[in-house]
Amino acid sequence: MSGYDDLIGTIPEIVNEAIMAEMRFYGYYPDGHGGYQGMAGLGGAPPPIAGPNMPDDGMVIPDMLNGGSISVRGIYHKWAERIPTMFNLYLGMPDPADFQAEADQIRVALEQLSSQGKTSEDDHDNIDFEGNSTLALAKTVSERLAGWQGAASASFQEYLNLFTTVVGNQALAAEAIRACMYMERELWNNSRNDVASFAANARAAFSHCGDISVDDIKQVISVVSTVNTVLGWFPAFKTVTAPVGKGLSVANVFVNTFGGQKEATNPLASRGVEDTWNNIVKADKDLRDKIRTTERDIDTSLSNIYDRVSAAPDIRSDGSTDQSLYHLPRPTGILNADEKGDVVQVTVDPALITDTADKLRSDLAPEMRTAAKSLNAGDTSGIWNRRAEIGIGSTGAYLSYLNVTDELHNEIKQTADELDWAADVLDAVADNYVKGDQAVAAALAEVHQKIVESAAPSGTGGHPTGGQLTPF
């Protein structure tokens, strides 16, 4: 059986088998020179007929079904149009390996977002990934802020307490997206195999149109009462019939003596050429329906993940934020601080404040940015391309994939940005121990302006649209 990569060469072979099948129906067989020769009758052999790759000789043959005559060239053209029109749709289907590469790219994000990682007994799909111990620094920073007593530090402490939960949810979202890439990989792996089998069966079905099979012969001889009588018709088998008991079935003797074996059932096979074609048409529809249904399910899964990631966090009855959120509510207390007392109301070593800022800026934020970057590694739309009739359109589930990875990328990047901005606030507070309140107010104003210019979301769910800035 030819594989999917051989499909472009298999298509003309199917055309040729279909033409030969119909020509056999009219009593014409290949002459060994590219043309066809009819069976000789009482009036002698009919004139030879030019083959499909030879100049048109204008020959017509009797139409045994409808009467009159039929153009031989019309037979050639019919199959030369029907077969490629159907099978060319399957050329250029997505490569399963490309979706493994996408899954591996998402794996990078998982290694950054997961504190524990994932292990399994079977890692043939590279499904395992290491945990990220750096995320534990969020707890260290939160504990440090707890002793500073400022309103802003309390706000940011609450933010960091949610950090591990939210980043864990982001990891779950990334894992769900990665699972969809495995589904796409298997869809195209299976579909390519199905197409290869479909093409091979179509070629074989036309090749055997009108053949006399083992079952046909069995049917003819089934009316004979005994094995001995059947084989007795053939002198060469008289020595075989002597020891054969009458209880042995005709079928068994036929198989054992003649060596005839029933061929594997070809779901497309039929005695007539048009019946075979009708079977192929139905199989084509069924195959494309299966691909379409499967990819639609993947597309729906990606859309559902997007809806969860992009939804505004719910507020519980006790006023706390729903733990299922995928992005962090902005710690407006610390980012709107006007003086150092908003952050620190106790005596703190400035070096400790600076160290806390460094943990946010140099440790936690880069981890988030690495994760975000892996979800925005460039335009991968090309790997989804195929004929629009295959799957759910010419780019399949790409738009849903793009939407959800872009949304998750933005949420993770937002987390990194806010860690940086909080670090800037802490640096300004540390400087205040030397420069005074007026200096810290100016430094904090610069942080506020940086946030506004970034057009970052407000943390209330969703992103600004139409280029609108989010003021503070």
Where are these regions (language model features)?
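N-terminal secretion-targeting helices of virulence/extracellular proteins
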Residues: 1-179, 183-204, 258-472
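Hydrophobic alpha-helical transmembrane segments and adjacent short intramembrane/lumenal linkers
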Residues: 199, 206-213
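Membrane-active amphipathic alpha-helices enriched in small hydrophobic residues
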Residues: 210-262
